[in-house]
Amino acid sequence: MIKRLLSFLDASPVNFLAVKNIADTLLANGFRRVDPSQPLGEVKSGDRFFVTKNDSSVFAFRIGNKPIADAGFHMICAHCDSPTFRIKPNAEMLTEGGIVKLNTEVYGSPIMSTWFDRPLTLAGRVIVRGEDVMQPQTLLLHIKRPLLQISNLAIHFNRQVNDGVALSKQKDVLPLLGQITSQLEAGNLLMNVILEELNSNAAGRELCAKDILDFDLYLADATPACTFGVHNEFISSGRLDDLSMCYAGLEALIASDTTDTTQVLALFDNEETGSQTKQGAGSPFLSFMLKRIALAQSNTEEAYYQAVERAFMISADNAHAWHPNYPEKYDPTNHPMLGGGPVIKFNAAQKYASDAVSAAVFAGLCEKAGVPCQRFVNHSDVAGGSTLGNILASSIPLRGVDMGNAILAMHSCRETGSVADHVFCVKVFTEFYS
């Protein structure tokens, strides 16, 4: 199970590739892809299908034995995006000595210093010319070798570096791409890299620079995910937040059988930037799909509203593990430990969807699955983050709980999680769908 997770993390450096890999797994396990621009058609018990939005979010459904109005739906939500750096248009910046760096902007809230002095690569999607101007072609890009690096300033020029130095997002975190060897490469180095990679994987069509219309490209850690520790009990990887929760939900959905209740896996994009996009949790897209299912079953919108009242949502986004070097940052009585099981998250300011009722439901699921669970509340003097649970609940008023596995160094280029916690999470998710 952990080897599958590590392979998924390595193959999913950005949201677009994560969604492709999830879609491929769904197809391989009997789910069919649905085009949301076409009629949904008849919906029967046991039907398995999924839909994507913007190539960066994916929603999978297994229809229950009972109509959605009668049995509701059980939904696991997570997000496919992670903090990183986006490549700007006109990105190449030629400096002295022919060294080329790339102009970037920050996506989300990364711990920027953790991206320094490590091999990085590029991944994302490239938009190329198609037959219809309204329907350009999308190609995914993942350069599977070290390509870039953000280099620190030597300590001899920055004696205060170990005392904490403010970083400029425009100046300090621009990665080195290469060094031009001829004037012909000037201004074309990035495009040449993109074309070389796309053409090496192309099936028949040879692309040239004029075919490239635009791109959504991001930096990614080039070092593979791994386990570490005396007993290999820890996981070290980028994007544990939140791809580990996405993959746990996927594994649970695949492992489950048809039950009375419809099963939903909703993996959104753009949680790290507020979720207010067509592919984010703030979009009505998921509610549209659920309503279409209800209408296909009963031909009445009333069925959708009944289904919502009978539904339960698990919003799965990683939680903060207790850090042995910084115990003062945590609540004195509610600080989850690595390996202690899934974490229920609470917040008096309603940043999380959990309440006493939904927390009791999730704790009961953990007990049935033979899995320990923990509770997290912020230290009252430390502002915490938020997640997608209540954003989704504001448009679909679902009963639900916010939870996640505990990790260290959230939003670092490489985060630390627990092998045992991933196994626990898949177990309780499978129990939920069952």
Where are these regions (language model features)?
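N-terminal hydrophobic/helix-forming segments and targeting peptides
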Residues: 1-434
